[in-house]
Amino acid sequence: MNNLKVWLLMAALSAILVLIGGAIGGKSGALLFFLISLGMNLFSYYYSDKVAISMTRSRPVSEEEAPGLYDVVRRLTKRAGLPMPRLYITPSPQPNAFATGRNPAHSAVAVTEGLLRLLNQSELEGVLAHELAHIKNRDVLIGTIAAAFAGAITMISNIVQWGAFFGMGQDDEEGGGGSFIASLLLALIAPVAAMIIQLAISRSREYLADETGARMAGNSGGLANALLKLDSAARRIPMQVNPAASHLFIVNPLSGESIARLFSTHPPISERVKRLNAMAI
């Protein structure tokens, strides 16, 4: 089912790029952006994890730097029958984490500096088990591709809107009116892209990752306590992250910001904690 959603997501986001091309350059623009979208589909499938790592400014971490982190991940992956993912540190004081990659054999888990400082052993195990559950359930590819495409669409929209702004002095015969209309069309692209992301990444996958992760860790209380801590910290400690990648994290890193609601795919923390506590593992 997730493989079908990946292809549907690629097709939908490619269609958005074609619409952008058509708004900019008519049929030739639409054709150009169609070819670009084909290239992006191939790139995002094989390299979207690297895009996600780059968007969050995460860096590789060695076992010498974080032996405790490696120990927990190695123990959990062995228990779950998963290969060892690449591990990264995200330079942010906000405690958070995410997983990325196209399949279990090509996966990565990133944790923030703040997460390693805040959580105790049981809570850290719960968070890492949740991220490994996303890998085990093969949720990470669709989330990572969505982040890569949404980031690209946002960048293209910004470039074209700046071009339209600086071309406002032209008259309609010189194309100024067309550029302005294109910029108005592009202003509608971000909500559409966000809606597609919300449809593609079901909140039920977060609930399933919570449940799978709790069983993997053998303790539902650790993840429940961690979610409460992370949610509280996310409201107090800002995180500089591209909104297009916010859905990758275990809790919304943009809590309290209006744009966070636009891109939010996170179910309420209170409901997630309630379900975990009901498991009583």
From Swiss-Prot:
Keywords (A to Z) from UniProt: Cell membrane, Hydrolase, Membrane, Metal-binding, Metalloprotease, Protease, Transmembrane, Transmembrane helix, Zinc
* A single Gene Ontology CC term: plasma membrane
Report the active site residues: 131
Q: Which domain of life is it from?
A: Bacteria
Query: Any transmembrane segments, and where?
Result: 6-26, 28-48, 140-160, 181-201
Under the heading Pfam families, the entry gives: Peptidase_M48
Cofactors per UniProt? Zn(2+)
Q: Where is the signal peptide?
A: none
Record's subcellular location: Cell membrane
Q: Name one GO biological process term.
A: proteolysis
Free-text remark on how the cofactor is bound: Binds 1 zinc ion per subunit.
The way it spans or sits in the membrane comes to: Multi-pass membrane protein
- The UniProt record gives the binding positions of Zn(2+) as 130, 134, 206
User: By its UniProt entry, which InterPro entries does this protein fall under?
Assistant: HtpX_protease, Pept_M48_protease_HtpX, Peptidase_M48
Principal subcellular localisation of the protein: membrane
Q: Which HAMAP family match?
A: Pept_M48_protease_HtpX
Q: Which family does it belong to?
A: Belongs to the peptidase M48B family.
Entry's PANTHER family? PROTEASE HTPX (PTHR43221:SF1)
Q: What is this protein called?
A: Protease HtpX homolog
Species annotation: Pelotomaculum thermopropionicum (strain DSM 13744 / JCM 10971 / SI)
Q: What is the lineage of its organism?
A: Bacteria, Bacillati, Bacillota, Clostridia, Eubacteriales
